[in-house]
């Protein structure tokens, strides 16, 4: 499994529309609107690098209103949330 964080700039009037459209693309697990240098942060979880390349260069490239993107690959997750999820599989409260 490959996890990527994709930083997106979009036309101001299209930010919400871009976010909605991105959230419906298979392989994209989360879309956040954020403050700062970028407008949106996208978390993608795909099978391999080829699938990531397809996602970024074909599926995301077709979303109207995206003006720039920067893709970062995640090497390792240190989030407590992710670790709790791994150990909770099969257990119920």
Where in this protein do the model-derived segments appear?
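A compositional/biophysical signature of low hydrophobicity enriched in polar/charged and small residues
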Residues: 1-93
């Amino acid at each position: 499994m490959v996890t990527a964080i994709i930083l997106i700039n979009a036309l101001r009037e299209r930010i919400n529309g871009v976010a909605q459209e991105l959230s419906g693309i298979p392989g994209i697990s989360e879309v956040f609107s954020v403050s700062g240098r970028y407008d949106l942060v996208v978390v993608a979880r795909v099978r391999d690098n080829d699938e990531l390349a397809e996602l970024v260069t074909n599926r995301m490239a077709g979303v109207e209103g995206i003006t720039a993107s920067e893709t970062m690959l995640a090497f390792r997750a240190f989030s407590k949330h992710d670790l709790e999820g791994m150990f909770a599989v099969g257990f119920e409260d």
